[in-house]
């Protein structure tokens, strides 16, 4: 609760029991909220450890977001009873695919494999087999494992740690399609035409044996360098099919954004050693297209058989967001077609307009923000971004609960039955959508903390970057190469009245005419990295449209070594919250108007005077000392900053 910005008094009994030490992170329950002359009181319930301990950022995020991270005793007992191999009795009613050369293609660090693929040419058509781990065979509705899985609804992925949806002996064991062992699976067997249309498909339970555990980079090397391998022929067939499906995707008008993903490499202490870009090659896209095809078939199968299930719905822009997008695009000389109801094709055409522009990635963010969030719902509204009339998640039942329910619904149709979850479909959709967002928020918190920790050693160093966002209180800059965002406060832009002009997405100086635009290249110095708020402050060295008029410190004056990285951009909305930068009011020379939301030196003096008066009044009051033991609580929630306007950028 960010309203609790003051110290919290802990109950003496709980303090005596846990004996926390200074610098430790604790978990406490609020007993009474603060009143006019009484602080909040909390009960200490857990001591997590020292703030600098390896993995502490994950422990904090788990508790901040209330992530279930320990399986119930009943779930653990039930999981132990699950066999570690396929039994003869499990094969009843299943198609035998053990001799079909299915392979898994995943990342180098993947541990759970829930999908395998196979493709072959049949005349002018292709046969595509997508085999998915049959989790529903082992996790039955409303049993102890299912109860815990539904509560979690998704696996949560942190750097160096995963909180799985299922117990490990299922997620990495009997349900994982590991190589050279028998596994139960649900299969989507498709025939795809030369034009990329799914001519026919069928679902059936099967038993399989993965013939190889391949990686994306390995497969890409075979494709690009024509290297020989026993599975090379099948990979070539899969790649030809992928190119057909990719062409169909473009014809369909699916919106496709290109962004740079990053990977954190850690040292032995669990802290970031370096951040490197992850190259997304055609091997990644190949598997993605295979999974999309199976997901579409699952949605159509359930609709055709009139069985309720959780569909993955993604709606287009709301009228308000559409109007905002059109206004911003117009100022940039761009236009979105489609009138009041633009289609995915209109969005795809817009993306083609700005391809190659220096601000292309920022325009992608604007387009994404105009769309609504994808959710799980028991009715089908289609998927705007993928340009599908019907879409469901079928391919990841090990890590997503909605996929598990889709498997159960498909099996029910095959057995001429009906599957109804204990929680009604609508409530289940709301719950699983919430858990998905919660997991994303927790992962983002941890990544931001780790990035901030990494930047602590870079304070004083100079980086090149690109303006990736702006508000009435400053500029957000994404640093080249390391893809980390920081804030340059508007009061640090120079000796002028700087105003934020949202209608043109620019910050402009009144007298100098200096303008900062989205996508502009700038040089910045790292001023501060605040671990409590996971925010990074930067100061401007050079940049803007009238650089010669600005009085700023040069690189030579600062004596800092300039770090120049390769130009790249990672879309990371979570880092777009500024932190308060403490500077003496006398040194703040920027002059700003009230609407710019910047504290001037005069305002600083007034605040200082008020603070002194308040202190004097407090000294005159005769207060009785509290008998409670007072310990300042460290949490991952950020306390509100004092500077006016330093709110989270939306």
Predicted features along the sequence, with ranges:
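Short terminal targeting/anchoring segments and short Lys/Arg-rich nucleic-acid-contact patches
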Residues: 574, 598-602
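Conserved, carboxylate-rich catalytic/transport cores that coordinate ions
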Residues: 1-592, 606-607, 620-623, 627, ...
């Amino acid at each position: 609760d960010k309203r609790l910005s003051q110290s919290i008094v802990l109950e003496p009994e709980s303090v005596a029991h846990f004996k926390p030490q200074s610098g430790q992170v604790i978990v406490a329950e609020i007993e009474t909220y603060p009143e006019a002359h009484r602080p909040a009181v909390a009960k200490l319930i857990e001591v997590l450890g020292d703030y600098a301990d390896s993995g502490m950022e994950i422990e904090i995020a788990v508790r901040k977001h209330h992530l279930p991270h320990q399986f119930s005793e009943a779930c653990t007992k039930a999981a132990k009873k699950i066999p570690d191999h396929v039994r003869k009795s499990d094969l009843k009613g299943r198609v035998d695919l053990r001799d079909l050369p299915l392979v898994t293609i995943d990342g180098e660090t993947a541990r759970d494999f829930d999908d395998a693929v196979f493709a072959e040419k049949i005349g002018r058509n292709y046969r595509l087999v997508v085999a998915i781990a049959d989790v529903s065979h082992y996790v039955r509705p409303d049993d102890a494992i299912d109860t815990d899985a539904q509560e979690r609804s998704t696996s949560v992925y942190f750097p160096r740690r995963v909180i799985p949806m299922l117990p490990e002996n299922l997620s990495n064991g009997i349900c994982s399609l590991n190589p050279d062992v028998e596994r139960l699976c649900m299969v989507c067997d498709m025939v795809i035409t030369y034009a990329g249309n799914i001519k026919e498909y069928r679902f059936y339970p099967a038993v399989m044996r993965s013939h190889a555990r391949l990686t994306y980079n390995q497969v890409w090397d075979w494709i690009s360098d024509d290297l020989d391998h026993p599975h090379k022929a099948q990979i070539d067939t899969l790649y030809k099919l992928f190119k057909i499906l990719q062409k169909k995707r473009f014809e369909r008008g699916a919106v496709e954004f290109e962004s740079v993903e990053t990977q954190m490499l850690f040292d032995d202490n669990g802290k970031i050693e370096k951040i490197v870009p992850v190259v997304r090659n055609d091997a990644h896209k190949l598997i993605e297209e295979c999974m999309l095809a199976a997901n579409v078939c699952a949605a159509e199968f359930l609709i055709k058989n009139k069985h309720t299930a959780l569909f993955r719905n993604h709606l287009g822009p709301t009228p308000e967001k559409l109007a905002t997008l059109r206004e911003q695009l117009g100022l940039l000389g761009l236009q979105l077609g489609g009138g009041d109801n633009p289609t995915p094709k209109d969005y795809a055409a817009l993306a083609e307009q700005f391809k190659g522009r220096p601000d292309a990635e920022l325009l992608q963010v604007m387009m994404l923000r105009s769309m609504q969030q994808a959710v799980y719902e028991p009715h089908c509204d289609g998927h705007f971004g993928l340009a599908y009339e019907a879409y469901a998640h079928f391919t990841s039942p090990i890590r997503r609960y909605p996929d598990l329910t889709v498997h159960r619904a498909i099996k029910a149709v095959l057995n001429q039955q009906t599957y109804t979850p204990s929680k009604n479909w609508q409530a289940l959709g709301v719950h699983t959508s919430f858990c998905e967002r919660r997991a994303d928020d927790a992962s983002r918190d941890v990544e931001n903390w780790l990035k901030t920790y990494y930047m602590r050693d870079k304070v004083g160093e100079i980086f090149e970057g690109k303006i990736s966002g702006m508000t009435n209180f400053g500029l957000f800059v994404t640093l080249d190469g390391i893809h980390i965002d920081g804030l340059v406060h508007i009061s640090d832009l120079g000796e002028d009245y700087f105003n934020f002009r949202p209608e043109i997405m620019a910050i402009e100086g009144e007298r100098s005419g200096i303008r900062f635009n989205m996508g502009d290249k700038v040089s910045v110095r790292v001023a501060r990295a605040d671990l409590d708020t996971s925010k990074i402050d930067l100061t401007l060295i050079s940049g803007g449209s009238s650089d010669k008029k600005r009085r700023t410190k040069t690189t030579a004056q600062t004596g800092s070594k300039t770090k120049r990285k390769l130009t790249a951009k990672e879309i990371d909305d979570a880092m777009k919250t500024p932190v308060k930068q403490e500077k003496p009011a006398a040194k703040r020379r920027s002059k700003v108007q009230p609407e710019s939301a910047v504290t001037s030196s005069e305002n600083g003096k007034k605040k200082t005077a008020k603070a002194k008066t308040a202190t004097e009044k407090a000294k005159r009051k005769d207060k009785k000392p509290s008998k409670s033991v007072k310990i300042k609580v460290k949490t991952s929630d950020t306390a509100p900053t004092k500077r006016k306007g330093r709110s989270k950028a939306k």
